[in-house]
C-alpha cells in the first residue's frame, strides 16, 4: 500500500485478544460477528469512494479479520510498513474503544508525524474525553457524514 493519502483501519475490540483471556459482554451474542467485532463500518466504503472520486488514494485495512484468520499475523509489524499521509480508525460502538485506541497508539509510535483520525458514534459523543486523555488521536470527525470534512 505505498503512498496512499488515507488508510482507514478497523481494529479488533481488544488489540491483544489472542493473548489475553477476555470476558466478552452479551452484545457480542446479538451482533452478527465474533466477539472481536471484525466487521468494519459501511461508512468506510462510502468515504473511500468519495475520496477516490475527488482524486485521493484511500484504502481500508481490516486488522481484526487479518488477526482472526492468521494467528501469526503481526499487526504492529504490518502497521509499521504502511505508507500513508493520514490514518483513520472507527469508534462507533464502545466495545471497539480499547482496540481502536491501542492500535492508534501503535500507529502513532511508528508514524509520529501522520495525523490520526477517529470517527463514529462513540467517538463523536466522547470527543472531549478522547482528545484530552488519548494523545495518539489528533482529530475526531463528529457526526454521521464525514465525506466532506475529509477533504478539508
Would you name each region that the model predicts?
Residues 2-4, 85:
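Nucleotide donor/acceptor-binding cores
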Residues 4-36:
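Short glycine-rich His-centered loop
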Residues 36-37, 93:
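A generic secondary-structure micro-motif detector
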Residues 43, 47-50, 54, 59-152:
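Glycine-rich beta-alpha loop elements in corrinoid/cobalamin-binding modules
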Amino acid at each position: 500500500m505505498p503512498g496512499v493519502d488515507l488508510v482507514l483501519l478497523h481494529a479488533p475490540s481488544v488489540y491483544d485478544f489472542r493473548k489475553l483471556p477476555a470476558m466478552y459482554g452479551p452484545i457480542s451474542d446479538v451482533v452478527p460477528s465474533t466477539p472481536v467485532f471484525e466487521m468494519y463500518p459501511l461508512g468506510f466504503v462510502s468515504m473511500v469512494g468519495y475520496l477516490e472520486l475527488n482524486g485521493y488514494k484511500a484504502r481500508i485495512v481490516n486488522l481484526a479479520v487479518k488477526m482472526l484468520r492468521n494467528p501469526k499475523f503481526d499487526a504492529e509489524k504490518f502497521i509499521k510498513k504502511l505508507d500513508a499521509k493520514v490514518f483513520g480508525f472507527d469508534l462507533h460502538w464502545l466495545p471497539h474503544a480499547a482496540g481502536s485506541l491501542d492500535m492508534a497508539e501503535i500507529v502513532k509510535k511508528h508514524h509520529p508525524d501522520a495525523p490520526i483520525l477517529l470517527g463514529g458514534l462513540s467517538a463523536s459523543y466522547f470527543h472531549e474525553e478522547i482528545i484530552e486523555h488519548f494523545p495518539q488521536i489528533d482529530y475526531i470527525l463528529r457526526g454521521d457524514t464525514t465525506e466532506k470534512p475529509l477533504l478539508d
